[in-house]
From Swiss-Prot:
Cellular component per GO, a single term: plasma membrane
Transmembrane parts of this sequence: 15-35, 61-81, 98-118, 120-140
Sequence similarity: Belongs to the multidrug resistance efflux pump SepA family.
Role, per record: Involved in multidrug efflux.
Bilayer disposition of the protein: Multi-pass membrane protein
Keywords, ordered alphabetically: Cell membrane, Membrane, Transmembrane, Transmembrane helix, Transport
Entry keyword Nucleotide-binding: no
Protein name as catalogued: Multidrug resistance efflux pump SepA
Subcellular location: Cell membrane
Disulfide bonding pattern of the chain: none
Organism: Staphylococcus epidermidis (strain ATCC 35984 / DSM 28319 / BCRC 17069 / CCUG 31568 / BM 3577 / RP62A)
Length: 155
């Protein structure tokens, strides 16, 4: 009987953690959606972008959502690839300081444009606007998540 109590306790804790994870993920996706909706309205108002795909709610969600997911996957992949190069080539001057960040930014912007953006004909955003948006994301990443030591590494 003690085993059953212990098992139900672990199941309850797992469900609580899973509930917190799902709720926080839903809140994050809601804020992301509102932020991207606001960004799209700003781009339309300033005549910097045009979003001409307007079917139903779910069609729009799949079309624009896949644009965001593929863009995120591209940015994430290039970021990890650049970190891999930086780790394996520590003495290379291109992977140190501002050179590393400029190369990461340029490669990420160009790859996003040619891998994702040109295939979405209903999303018309100028290249320089994409450069500014991705540059802003890089600045936010460096401000809020600077390179730091692994605090769990005990030596």
């Amino acid at each position: 009987m003690k085993f059953l109590k212990n098992k139900s306790y672990h199941l309850l804790v797992t469900l609580i953690v899973l509930t917190i994870f799902v709720i926080s993920g839903a809140i994050f996706l809601t804020f992301l959606g509102f932020g991207l909706y606001g960004l799209s309205r700003i781009l339309i108002y300033l005549h910097l972008g045009d979003f001409s795909y307007n079917k139903g709610f779910y069609d729009n969600l799949i079309y624009y959502g896949s644009y965001i997911v593929l863009g995120y996957f591209t940015l994430f992949s290039i970021e990890h690839l650049m970190d891999y190069f930086k780790k394996n080539l520590p003495k290379n001057p291109y992977f140190q300081g501002i050179n590393f960040h400029l190369i990461s930014y340029i490669v990420t912007t160009i790859m996003f444009y040619f891998i994702v953006h040109i295939h979405y004909v209903h999303v018309n955003i100028h290249f320089w606007v994409i450069m500014i948006i991705i540059g802003f994301l890089f600045v936010c990443k460096e401000v809020f998540y600077p390179e730091s030591k692994n605090l769990n590494n005990k030596k």
